[in-house]
Structures are given as structure tokens and as C-alpha cells.
């Protein structure tokens, strides 16, 4: 078994909607990023890559490469997981915490879990997504951006 941790943060800017966990969520602002700005999938991808000792999302998909401009983060997650499978690992479980004052994530979490389970070729019970606020503290509390943490467990096939 191998454990990895991932973290991502993106600042609000421009027009919405935002994409979190592969779900388009209506919001008055978007998230500034080279890709689609999906903090949940970026943190999850980093956690998985870390568990497999494959570096991080920036190493595999650098923001200096125009090929990744505006890219769907589900595509990046699937590519990273393909490399992990080549090393002989599969998902044990994935736990994601979205940290956002707004918008509310709860109505969108079921579809996020479906998307992740589909992309990681695993049972939905292997995927947990939850959301919290910072009680109006810090940049998240001031609604300046969204952060996300993820922990992944990989098991050898």
C-alpha cells in the first residue's frame, strides 16, 4: 500500500461557472488557471501521483505547455491514473476535502463521486468527497478562491 497527499488552490477571477470534481457549478466568477481550474481533480491527481512516486501534476502537465491550456482536468486525471496502473497499482480509496466559502458544494458532491469513480475505474464507495468552509477566515473565507486537499491510497495489483 502507498499513500499520497495532494493540495491545490485557485483564485477567483473572470466569469463563471466553475468546474469542481468535473461538475460545472454556476457561480458569478470563474477560477483563474492554465487548465480548467478544477481544484478537486488537481488535488486528487497530485495525491495519486505522489502515492505512486510519479512526481506531481505540474511535472506531468506543465502550465508552460500550450497543449494544456484550458484542458479538461478529467483528461489529466485519467492520463495520470493510466501511468499509475502501468506501475502495477490501483486505487484503494480517495478522500477529497473541498475548502470553499462559496458556492455551496453539497448538491454537486454525488456527481463528483460518480465522475471520479468513472475516471479511476473503481467503485463509488472507494471515493469520498466532502466540503467545508473556513468560517469566513483567510482568502477562502473572503471568497477570493477555493482550496482542496486529497489523500489517496494505492494498492499493488
From Swiss-Prot:
Pathway: Isoprenoid biosynthesis; isopentenyl diphosphate biosynthesis via DXP pathway; isopentenyl diphosphate from 1-deoxy-D-xylulose 5-phosphate: step 4/6
Statement: the UniProt record of this protein carries the keyword NAD: no
Domain of life: Bacteria
Residue ranges of the TM segments: none
Binding site for 4-CDP-2-C-methyl-D-erythritol 2-phosphate: 8-10, 34-35, 56-58, 61-65, 100-106, 132-135, 139, 142
InterPro entries, per the entry: MECDP_synthase, MECDP_synthase_CS, MECDP_synthase_sf
Residues of the site described as Transition state stabilizer: 34, 133
Function recorded in the entry: Involved in the biosynthesis of isopentenyl diphosphate (IPP) and dimethylallyl diphosphate (DMAPP), two major building blocks of isoprenoid compounds. Catalyzes the conversion of 4-diphosphocytidyl-2-C-methyl-D-erythritol 2-phosphate (CDP-ME2P) to 2-C-methyl-D-erythritol 2,4-cyclodiphosphate (ME-CPP) with a corresponding release of cytidine 5-monophosphate (CMP).
Protein name according to UniProt: 2-C-methyl-D-erythritol 2,4-cyclodiphosphate synthase
